[in-house]
Amino acid sequence: MPELPEVEVSRQGISPWLTGIKVTRVVVRDGRLRWPVPGEIQELVDLTIHRVSRRAKYLLLETDFGTADLHLGMSGSLRVLNIGTPAEKHDHVDIELANGKLLRLNDPRRFGALLWTREPAEAHALLAKLGPEPLTDAFNAEYLQGRAKGRSTAIKTFLMDNHVVVGVGNIYANEALYAAGIHPKRAAGNISAERLETLVAEIKRVLASAIQQGGTTLKDFTSADGKPGYFVQQLQVYGRGGQACFHCHTLLSEIRLGQRTTVFCSHCQR
């Protein structure tokens, strides 16, 4: 599943081709995605995309009269191609542009989405109650301590709640907790301010590094130019259950926590 770094890499890849460009045509081959693609998406035609932004894992194509909201779901990907490039299996939507390019959404598992809203993007029901972006100053140790106070929820589950902070998905929660030396099952409200400060710093470092490396390619994700992400080569714990910890050589434990695979070092993480 594409997480925040993968979505940000996609945003960076498509933005130069879309920003300041008029939409000439929207082709919906199969609109049966997570939510049906609305007929109103055709309102995008003849509008100029002024900005390609991201909120959590949503990509926002912003115009003066509305916003197209894209979500990649479990297996979605975007490509910038020349108009006329033949569609392949699972190529569900094309947004054709006045510069001769098109933005193509491919989604084998159909958990992605393409929505249209005339209201400000941040006011949309899917976005309005989300927590802060993890790479902004709004996400800091003081904020996290305030949200965690009195909470018995496991810290990993707590971090993956997008009402607390967006974009800290399973891969990066595993990696950040390992880097911070915090056991994933430790109660969120039972972590000192000093350790939370370390955790926040590691979340920011891990996410920024993943973006710089083009994301993590485990199965489905490739960037807008079709290239894989290389952060997989830097994973310390995720996907390595039963293998030796790189630091202390203890065999890494693998459990299910909040219905998600969780890998940690019982020696290094407390």
Curated annotation (Swiss-Prot):
Reactions mediated catalytically: Hydrolysis of DNA containing ring-opened 7-methylguanine residues, releasing 2,6-diamino-4-hydroxy-5-(N-methyl)formamidopyrimidine; 2'-deoxyribonucleotide-(2'-deoxyribose 5'-phosphate)-2'-deoxyribonucleotide-DNA = a 3'-end 2'-deoxyribonucleotide-(2,3-dehydro-2,3-deoxyribose 5'-phosphate)-DNA + a 5'-end 5'-phospho-2'-deoxyribonucleoside-DNA + H(+)
Positions contributing to DNA binding: 90, 109, 151
Keywords associated with the record: DNA damage, DNA repair, DNA-binding, Glycosidase, Hydrolase, Lyase, Metal-binding, Multifunctional enzyme, Zinc, Zinc-finger
InterPro entries: DNA_glyclase/AP_lyase_DNA-bd, DNA_glyclase_Znf_dom_DNA_BS, Formamido-pyr_DNA_Glyclase, FPG_cat, MutM-like_N-ter, Ribosomal_uS13-like_H2TH, Znf_DNA_glyclase/AP_lyase
GO MF entry, a single one: class I DNA-(apurinic or apyrimidinic site) endonuclease activity
Domain of life: Bacteria
UniProt family annotation: Belongs to the FPG family.
Quaternary organization: Monomer.
Protein name stated in the entry: Formamidopyrimidine-DNA glycosylase
Organism: Aeromonas salmonicida (strain A449)
